[in-house]
Structure formats: structure tokens, C-alpha cells
Amino acid sequence: MVGFGLGTLRYVPEESKDKVTSDEDVLGTLLKVFQALFLNDFNKQSEILTMLPESVKSKYQDLLAVEHQGVKLLENRHQQQSTFKPEEILYKTLGFSVAQATSSLISAGKGVFVTKGLVPKGAVVSMYPGTVYQKYEPIFFQSIGNPFIFRCLDGVLIDGNDKGISKVVYRSCNGRDRLGPLKMSDSTWLTSEIHNPLAVGQYVNNCSNDRAANVCYQEFDVPAVFPIELKQYLPNIAYSYDKHSPLRCVVLVALRDINQGEELFSNYYTIVS
């Protein structure tokens, strides 16, 4: 493997090529969550809505009407919308919520926990955010002392560090790809106010002898048909602009039912080179 200085890499082992959940199910979950987030933020989406086809606008208005059937006044609807936090939307949509907290492992720092509900086996429980690098792209300086670099099977790297030069690079790419009010990715995972509640996968700790893995990493390429108005919730962006290649994402999938209060543990290898 090419040296990465003092950096460490997480990666999907070769024997994990078989996907726990189909790409269709992963896509379905992301669309379901992102659409719910979009509807929850509907009164903030006016600029984006003006750029969408009438058929798409009508679809969201119909969905919103169904969601708020019992609400007669527009003001009340907006007031009701503003009461839901992203993690509450996640719970309403998938039946569980996850969040960062101090890990149950000594000296492990942050971890990710199921804060409410039950995660069923096979469910997408979080996403691994960050800048996506092709294997030929420069990442040496970003990798120094960086424990948040994830290596995919094909050598694609995802830098999930929310600090330092990694943060600067992500913000720069995020601004580069923006089309007026249309954001091609979500940068709020770099802040304390996360809009996509799934974007906490970089803080999932490795399993240990007494803490078996309950989630696994799974690669997912965003299809070309992904709704442009929902890309604002994707917590990944390509280092180099390339409209022809699909965006690589990595999701974490439950290996078993995971109960409220449990910490998520993955199975990754750390390589120091």
C-alpha cells in the first residue's frame, strides 16, 4: 500500500464484498429520510422550489398536505414543522435515532449510540461523511495524523475528519459545486447543528474482544437519477469535480437488531504506514 505518512486508514476487508443490504434498499432509505427532512424544512426551500419542475413541486405540496391533514392554518403548519429536530425526523421516519456521545470504551473519545427506538437488522443506521478522493488524487497532507480516512475496496478514500485542513477542503469543494440555491452536498456535519442525522458514521468505534461489531460498512454509489433537491443532505463530495462519475458514499448497516442505548461498533482495520 502507498504510504500515508502518520495517517491511519479504515477499510472494508476483501471478504466483506457481499452486501448486507441491497443498493435499492439503501437508496430507498436515503430517499425516505431526505424527503422527510426536505418536507420538515419546506418553508426554507422557496428558492430551491422555484428551480424545480412543476410536477416535482406539486409532488412535495401533495406530500406536505397529506402529512399535515389536520392542520388548517398555514402558520400553524409552519409552527409545527419548526418543532421537529433532524433526529426526531429520523425517528419518525425509520423508527430510531442515533447521535454522538462519549463512548463506553475507555479513552475512545466519541462514539455513536442508538438514542431512541430499535434498529432492525439490515437497516442503514448511519453514513460516513467526508471528501471523496480517487486513488490517484493527492491526500498526503490531509492524512497526517488523521484517523478518519476510510479506504474503499477499489482504493477510493473518504476523509471524514471535521477539523483542520480536511474541514477546509470539504467546505471549499462544497462551495465549488453549488448551483445557485441548490447545494450538491451537506456541510453541516462539520458543525454542531447537523441537518442530516445519519452523518455521524466517522465516530463509530471499532469492536473489541468484549464488544462485538453490530454494524458493517457498505459502499454505495449515488445514482444519476438521485433528486437534485435532496442532494443538500448528502454528507459527501468529490475532491475533483467530475459530473460523469457517481458520488461514492459509505453507509453503516446493522448486523443485528440494535436496541435503544446501545453503542454502535464496526469492524475495521487500522493501518499505520
Curated annotation (Swiss-Prot):
**Ranges for the SET domain?**
96-269
User: Any idea of its EC number?
Assistant: 2.1.1.-
User: What domain of life does the native source organism fall in?
Assistant: Eukaryota
Q: Which UniProt keywords apply?
A: Methyltransferase, S-adenosyl-L-methionine, Transferase
What's a single GO BP term from this record? methylation
Q: Which residues form a coiled coil?
A: none
From the record, give the transmembrane residue ranges: none
Positions annotated to bind S-adenosyl-L-methionine: Y268
Which PROSITE patterns does the protein's record reference?
SET (PS50280)
Q: Which GO terms describe its molecular function?
A: methyltransferase activity
Q: Which family does it belong to?
A: Belongs to the class V-like SAM-binding methyltransferase superfamily.
Q: What is this protein called?
A: SET domain-containing protein 9
Gene encoding this chain? Answer: SETD9
